Amino acid sequence: MSFPRGSYDPAASNSSPWWPLSAEDANSSWEAAGHQKGSDPSGDVRNEELAKLEIAVLAVIFVVAVLGNSSVLLALHRTPRKTSRMHLFIRHLSLADLAVAFFQVLPQLCWDITYRFRGPDWLCRVVKHLQVFAMFASAYMLVVMTADRYIAVCHPLKTLQQPTRRSRLMIAASWVLSFLLSTPQYFIFSMIEIEVNNGTKTQDCWATFIQPWGTRAYVTWMTSGVFVVPVVILGTCYGFICYHIWRNVRGKTASRQSKGSGEDVAPFHKGLLVTPCVSSVKTISRAKIRTVKMTFVIVTAYILCWAPFFIVQMWSVWDDNFIWTDSENPSITITALLASLNSCCNPWIYMFFSGHLLQDCVQSFPCCQRMVQKFTKDDSDNMSRRHTSYSNNRSPTNSTGTWKDSPKSSRSIRFIPVST
């Protein structure tokens, strides 16, 4: 995954097109790094050690994302349980994360390996469009799933009005909106001829911006559309969910206390009668805990994965003192690459909170199933042996001595005649 470079590539750059710099910015960064003004900043070289690190990180992310999301899809396909609306959203979220793996991470991995983009102009435009499309799809699928949970908890009566149809419309809207918002990539990126190695010409897939505000406008728009807006919506929806459940629990608790004191008075809140939406306090408590935990994990994972990338992007275009060689810092490069790690986390988060999905996923693989059966059998045998040993060492009086050592064993029993 990457944001565009500008119309000129400094010598210090790696193969990943991370920071969109103009020719003037690149030259000033080269001079600020301590090079002479007359030296050539256009050598077609890169930091090979850092490039190898980028390739390794992207390869691991790609493998983990594909395996994790494919396992979720396989578990959903083979589960014997009835498919719910949440399963529908999880399925499409996994598809969106697979799009991130194949349309975003994999092209960037190939690009890092070849250093320069190898392909015609139309392929350059398509690749850049699909990369951003995957970013939008993964973020917006999470948003519509959160919106569905908000409707289910805060407006339960609306779930009776064709809930499956509404869910499918929300999912379709997120896919279409993601495609439309990423369409400008076709007009921003193209194969551009650049000058390297003292006048040698080559081509690469770059973006062309109106200077000096074009780059800032693009990065700010992407940061707002992919990160800021989804985080605000996620936080707002889950905030209402937690508040609604907390108010429901408080109303139910007050009702129980009034019944215990013999007062037949319903709890009031701001002059309105508070009626619990769920019939069981225990059920509400579990739902509250599960919602709070899932909220914390989802929002935290999303922010931790995406925040470093967008912080670096915004810093690079809004800080006039930003030096190009700062992008060669391995820590900055790796934190930017880890944005795609969110697609690796999502399947395991939902399998953990869904419970049975993890079991269905394990049962989908024969090797894992045999391993689980072996461990279960070993545990059963160990329990059986412990139970047998415990039973043999207990006396008829449940003392710790053995049967033959018991004072009430068979040899001390006296047969007393019974009168008839």
UniProtKB/Swiss-Prot annotation:
It is found in: Cell membrane. A lipid is attached at C367, C368 (S-palmitoyl cysteine). Residues 76-92, 147-168, 247-294, 353-420 are cytoplasmic. It is a multi-pass membrane protein. Residues 389-403 have a biased composition (Polar residues). Residues 1-20, 379-411 are annotated as: Disordered. It comes from the Eukaryota. Disulfide bonds join C124-C205. Keywords: Cell membrane, Disulfide bond, G-protein coupled receptor, Glycoprotein, Lipoprotein, Membrane, Palmitate, Phosphoprotein, Receptor, Transducer, Transmembrane, Transmembrane helix. Receptor for arginine vasopressin. The activity of this receptor is mediated by G proteins which activate a phosphatidyl-inositol-calcium second messenger system. Involved in social memory formation. This is Vasopressin V1a receptor. It comes from Microtus ochrogaster (Prairie vole). The lineage of its organism: Eukaryota, Metazoa, Chordata, Craniata, Vertebrata.
